[in-house]
């Protein structure tokens, strides 16, 4: 559309006249209101108000004298006069603001619409939009992510379970529920620093996995003041030798079901090397083999050293004899424990099925199992899984990493390994993480209640910690009372690690934070699709006829709400928050070293009570 534009002088005249009319109107309306309140009939001409407005500054203490007779005599006292004038001026200002906004509104673009009950025009969130996420300070059970203005941004807490009719405000509320958090950002973008700040303000139990020493060094001291701290670091990358906490897949392998769960936890964490589909078959077969071997090792009072030997040598009945595993099975069949005897019969079926397969197939199954148990050929990992024996050859229980100990207080488990060992030892670290999470599933199934207080699980460099069950974890852990926080270098890293399952993982992370510096196409395209395009007013000026002053042409164009260059060029410390059904928000990270109370917590020395592993 086209309309004639106002020159600068014309615009100045309009502004001056408008201000003058508003002032005279306030004087006239205030005096008329004062007369009405005093009980007199207001009959003040507008021209008299214009004359009074000129003399009013000189008669502030006696405003009636600014008016000509006979109006001056009828006006009430100074208090009522000025109160009425202030009220009238406020009303006129409000009306003027509404008119100005209405006149200046965009007269082009699409009409306002609300498809599916949502504003069809995309925009960034304001404070009221983020109400479900904003807290004034650290809140129990909620993980602080960032800062929005003077408020902190934290994960949501589960809504109260109330009976009866839901009120109007509750129906209109965008409040959701606790959900997983995903942080995306290149190296040195502040994502781990933001996670450290959240951990320092978390007051419940926690499992913290990282390939860098930053997370351990800055949070271990403070966490040790809240509860016991145990560090699983079999390579001694962050702890002295033989100081690592102990954990073995054999801990729960005393029953057939326990052995199957232990084997599944290990195979879920095994590296796949980019193989899709076909690798799942071999891992499933290796899981059958390992479940039997773990059961035999546990009940025969052997350790993971023996399991490694059985897999690497393909121990089985042959021409040279029955083999060690077959002999142990026969011994367990004669056990005084009926449960052990029945279990031996069950696992024997799976083992025999593997042993009797064609040579090439059997070798492939053992080769796959070797990649799963390979970490326990490392002396440090083997030592951390080797429980000392008590008298008469009985196995002494681990001072161990299990869920009951973790939930007994605000206790913490750290999983630490250098980046160069992360993939090599993935089944050990991923197996422990899977074991703890699976225990949470069983605990909630047995009690019928989510964990309270909730358990925090932080996986730094999640792309280097492969977990086949991560899609299920992202979608179900929140309902169990487990808050999952995963940290990635980019969305492309997630897609490389999980392939087609990446979309499922991303969707089920309720909260997603994108930090400054992202430049991979996967992240840019995702943000562009999710945020959509905003309508932007454009104006072009035509000055073909100098005497006419030209004309302005107004239209709208559609631009991405967060263009690629904006996502990359954000200030360090800025981030884009995408949460559930809320509009996207521009937030700031909270470096722990810039907050005095967080810096003091990060500098806390490790207590003696917290060092016990």
Model-derived segments and their meaning:
Residues 1-20, 28-189, 193-197, 532-533, ...:
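Basic- and hydrophobic-enriched, low-structure N-terminal and domain-boundary segments
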Residues 25-26, 30, 34-35, 182-482, ...:
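P-loop NTPase motor domains
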Residues 89-90, 281-284, 410, 472-475, ...:
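P-loop NTPase motor core of the ASCE superfamily
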Residues 96, 108-141, 255-267, 313, ...:
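Short alpha-helical interface patches
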Residues 173, 449-450, 504:
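Structural motif
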Residues 205-209, 229-233, 483-489, 512-516, ...:
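Short hydrophobic alpha-helical runs that function as membrane-insertion/retention elements
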Residues 418, 462, 489-491, 517-518:
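Histidine- and/or cysteine-centered catalytic micro-motif in compact active-site loops
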Residues 477-496:
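Sensor-1/coupling segment of RecA-like P-loop NTPase cores
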């Amino acid at each position: 559309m086209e309309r004639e534009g106002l020159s600068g002088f014309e615009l100045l005249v309009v502004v001056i006249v408008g201000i003058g009319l508003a002032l005279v109107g306030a004087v006239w309306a205030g005096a008329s209101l004062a007369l009405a309140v005093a009980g007199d009939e207001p009959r003040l001409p507008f021209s008299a108000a214009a004359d009074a407005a000129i003399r009013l500054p000189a008669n502030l203490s006696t405003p009636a004298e600014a008016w000509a007779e006979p109006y001056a005599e009828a006006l009430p006292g100074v208090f009522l006069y000025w109160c009425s004038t202030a009220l009238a001026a406020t009303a006129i200002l409000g009306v003027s603001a509404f008119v100005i906004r209405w006149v200046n509104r965009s007269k082009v673009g699409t009409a306002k619409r609300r498809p599916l009950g949502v504003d069809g025009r995309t925009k960034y969130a304001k404070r009221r939009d983020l109400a479900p996420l904003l807290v004034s300070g650290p809140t129990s059970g909620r993980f602080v992510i960032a800062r929005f203005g003077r408020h902190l941004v934290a994960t949501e807490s589960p809504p109260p379970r109330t009976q009866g009719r839901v009120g109007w405000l509750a129906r209109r509320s965008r409040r959701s529920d606790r959900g997983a958090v995903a942080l995306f950002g290149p190296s040195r973008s502040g994502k781990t620093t933001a996670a450290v700040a959240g951990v320092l303000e978390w007051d419940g139990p926690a499992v913290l996995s990282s390939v860098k020493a930053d997370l351990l060094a800055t949070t271990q001291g403070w966490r040790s003041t809240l509860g016991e701290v145990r560090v699983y670091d079999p390579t001694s990358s962050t702890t002295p030798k033989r100081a690592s906490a102990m954990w073995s897949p054999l801990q729960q392998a005393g029953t057939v079901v326990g052995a199957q769960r232990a084997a599944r936890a290990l195979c879920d964490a095994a590296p796949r090397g980019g193989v899709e589909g076909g690798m799942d078959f071999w891992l499933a077969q290796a899981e059958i083999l390992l479940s039997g071997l773990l059961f035999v090792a546990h009940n025969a009072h052997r350790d993971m050293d023996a399991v490694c030997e059985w897999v690497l040598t393909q121990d089985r009945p042959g021409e040279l004899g029955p083999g060690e595993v077959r002999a142990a099975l026969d011994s367990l069949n004669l056990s005084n424990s009926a449960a052990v005897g029945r279990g031996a019969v069950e696992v024997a079926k799976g083992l025999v099925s593997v042993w009797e397969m064609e040579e090439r197939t059997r070798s492939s199954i053992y080769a796959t199992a070797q990649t799963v148990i390979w970490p326990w050929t490392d002396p440090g990992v083997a030592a951390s899984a080797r429980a000392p024996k008590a008298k008469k050859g009985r196995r002494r229980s681990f001072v161990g990493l299990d869920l009951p100990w973790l939930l007994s207080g605000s206790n913490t488990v750290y999983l630490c390994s250098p980046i160069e060992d992360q993939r090599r030892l993935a089944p050990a670290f991923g197996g422990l993480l899977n074991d703890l999470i699976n225990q949470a599933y069983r605990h909630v199934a047995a009690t019928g209640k989510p964990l309270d207080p909730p358990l925090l699980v932080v996986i730094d460099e999640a792309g280097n910690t492969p977990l086949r069950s991560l899609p299920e974890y992202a979608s179900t852990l929140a309902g169990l009372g487990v808050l999952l926080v995963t940290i990635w270098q980019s969305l492309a890293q997630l897609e490389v690690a999980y392939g087609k399952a990446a979309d499922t993982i991303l969707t089920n992370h309720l909260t997603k934070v994108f930090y400054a510096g992202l430049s991979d196409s996967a992240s840019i395209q995702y943000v562009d699709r999710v945020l959509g395009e905003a309508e932007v007013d454009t104006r072009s000026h035509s000055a073909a006829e100098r005497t006419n002053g030209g004309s302005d042409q107004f239209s709208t164009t559609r631009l991405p709400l967060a263009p690629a260059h904006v996502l990359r060029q954000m200030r360090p410390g800025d981030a884009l928050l995408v949460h559930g059904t809320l509009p996207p928000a521009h937030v700031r990270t909270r470096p722990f070293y810039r907050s005095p109370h967080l810096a003091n917590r990060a500098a806390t020395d490790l207590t003696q009570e917290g060092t016990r592993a």
